[in-house]
Amino acid sequence: MKLHDLKPTPGSRKDRKRVGRGPGGTDKTAGRGHKGQKSRSGAGKGAFFEGGRSRLIARLPKRGFNNVGTTYEVVKLSQLQDLEDTTFDRDTLEAYRLVRRKNRPVKLLASGEISRAVTVHVDAASAAAIKAVEAAGGRVVLPEVQTQQDDAQKAE
C-alpha cells in the first residue's frame, strides 16, 4: 500500500451541498425560504439584539472611567544591581524579562540600591533614581522632549 492508494472509508465523507445552482432541490431560494430578513445576504441580528427592547448594555448604569494617565513598565534599581550588563536599554530589559509590555513606556524607580556604574536608557525616571545612579558613577539617559517652541526655532 502506498500513499496514493489511501482513500477515505465509503460513507465517511459527505459532499458539500451546492445551493442555488439550477433546478433539483436547493435552486431558486437556496434553502432560505421566500423574502424576509433571513433570506437576504448579510442578514442577521447583532449579537446583543433583543427584539427591539433596550439592550442589556444600555439598561445598566455607566460606571468608572478611562484613566488618561500613563501607565509605566517599572524597573527598580535593585533589579539592575544583580545583572551583569553595564548598559541597559529597552531591548536589554526585555531580554532580561524586566519589561513585558512593548506598548508601555519604561520608568526607572529608586527601589533598592545600586553600587556600580551603569548607563540606563529609559523613557522616565524618578529624581531619586537618577540621583542614586549618578552617585554610583553611572548615568540615566532620558529622551529629549520636543516642544512647540523648539519646533518654531528650528523653522526660523
Swiss-Prot record:
What InterPro entries does the record point to? Ribosomal_uL15, Ribosomal_uL15/eL18, Ribosomal_uL15/eL18_sf, Ribosomal_uL15_bac-type, Ribosomal_uL15_CS
Annotated Pfam families: Ribosomal_L27A
Q: Give the top-rank taxon of the lineage listed in the UniProt record for this protein.
A: Bacteria
Which intervals of the chain are annotated as region Disordered? 1-48
Q: Name one GO biological process term.
A: translation
A molecular function annotated in GO for this UniProt entry is: rRNA binding
Give the originating organism: Deinococcus radiodurans (strain ATCC 13939 / DSM 20539 / JCM 16871 / CCUG 27074 / LMG 4051 / NBRC 15346 / NCIMB 9279 / VKM B-1422 / R1)
Assigned keywords, A-Z: Ribonucleoprotein, Ribosomal protein, RNA-binding, rRNA-binding
By sequence similarity, the record places it as follows: Belongs to the universal ribosomal protein uL15 family.
Coiled-coil ranges per the record? none
Gene3D superfamilies registered for this protein in UniProt: 3.100.10.10
Quaternary structure and interacting proteins, as annotated: Part of the 50S ribosomal subunit. Contacts proteins L4, L21 and L35.
Question: What is the protein's known function?
Answer: Binds to the 23S rRNA.
Q: Write out the GO cellular component annotations.
A: cytosolic large ribosomal subunit
- Designated name of the protein: Large ribosomal subunit protein uL15
